[in-house]
């Protein structure tokens, strides 16, 4: 790009080079950018609520291991992003939130929709006060390399100014992630070693590289456990894979191990539960890895010598469905492809899905694992679907949601309908919010009819298989409403 150009044009040129899809909702203070994106090569997905834009960007980021971008106007548009950005912050997801602002001369002067926008800076935010493309590049780099959400707040009068540093066309032009974490560990010489793998092992690997990690890990001569978001990084059917550990997983293996080698886990209270936390921390060795290529990861494990490990640990805590709710979840899981991307909301359905699903590939389950956000499921599954399209990921997308969470962002069914997104959307209708209280529900099937989305209603568990098989043969969305009885959750490890 040469010559004198406006900041708006330079910004969209940068976005075109680095982004395929943006999730947005228009508004006065962001309208110049919104309109310019509409005329670009970027897919501009208009959501029906800014919360949907944030959650879609989050789902997109999680499946692609890249950046998900959302766009919202100033004031109420930006405040609607608060919960999605908080979710991305807690769950370590690369979401870039581009927000509008009034003209600079009105900032701090009680102007229409003007508020301090720092509330979105959970990790970091940039107030763009100069027409410099470097702001955008820095925001991209911070977002991608640190796996955290970043806000880019732009006053509306800045778009007309002449752009500076237009030679910057991608985030790598100004940001070189040359950091090579130093790991002194070369050998592991204990009788009962255990590897704990968290999602940090994904680094900045591409999706195609991430799915190859299992082949590397299966050669390690000791048990391997994972955190919730890292499930499937090693196939849970393999002999040396324990699977999920912690609050909703196996705890005995962590206690029996002589040493725990942690790669990529933040060691949250979901993984190291409070009752044994200090004991587990005392025997944990943390390895800092931020792999930028699968080759780098392969070389690390090839040079790591695991000595004297004859320990074979079998996870005997496999949960079996026993009630109406868990049996119906299990029937859904049995009838979808084993590599399907299951997106859950927050609630009982998430716990049962977690307990009943054997994960065979990374991102087999995507959930708000650290923030527990209701309303996450539907828009996140939409973002996941767009991610699979943009990055040629040939996997089915399945939403399993509760009735309470589904209603929180039900308006985003319009995005599903407009784009004919093939998503299997399951609503577990038990007419309650977990064990908290009973709720009254609308007719979900009539809601689907209003959006002109195919739908069905299921009462009996033996109806589930045929409906899913029929769906898999078609190329359009389906909403499945599953009437179910309540069922108490098994007690977690605490």
Swiss-Prot record:
PANTHER family: ACETOLACTATE SYNTHASE CATALYTIC SUBUNIT, MITOCHONDRIAL, THIAMINE PYROPHOSPHATE ENZYMES
Domain of life, source organism: Archaea
Alphabetized GO MF terms: acetolactate synthase activity; flavin adenine dinucleotide binding; magnesium ion binding; thiamine pyrophosphate binding
InterPro entries documented for this protein: DHS-like_NAD/FAD-binding_dom, THDP-binding, Thiamin_PyroP_enz_cen_dom, Thiamin_PyroP_enz_TPP-bd_dom, TPP_enz, TPP_enzyme_TPP-bd
Protein name per its UniProtKB record: Uncharacterized protein MJ0663
Keywords: Thiamine pyrophosphate
Family: Belongs to the TPP enzyme family.
One GO process term, biological-process aspect: sulfur compound biosynthetic process
GO CC, any one term: acetolactate synthase complex
Cited SUPFAM superfamilies: DHS-like NAD/FAD-binding domain, Thiamin diphosphate-binding fold (THDP-binding)
Keyword Transmembrane helix among record annotations: no
Signal peptide positions on this chain: none
Gene3D superfamilies: 3.40.50.970, TPP-binding domain
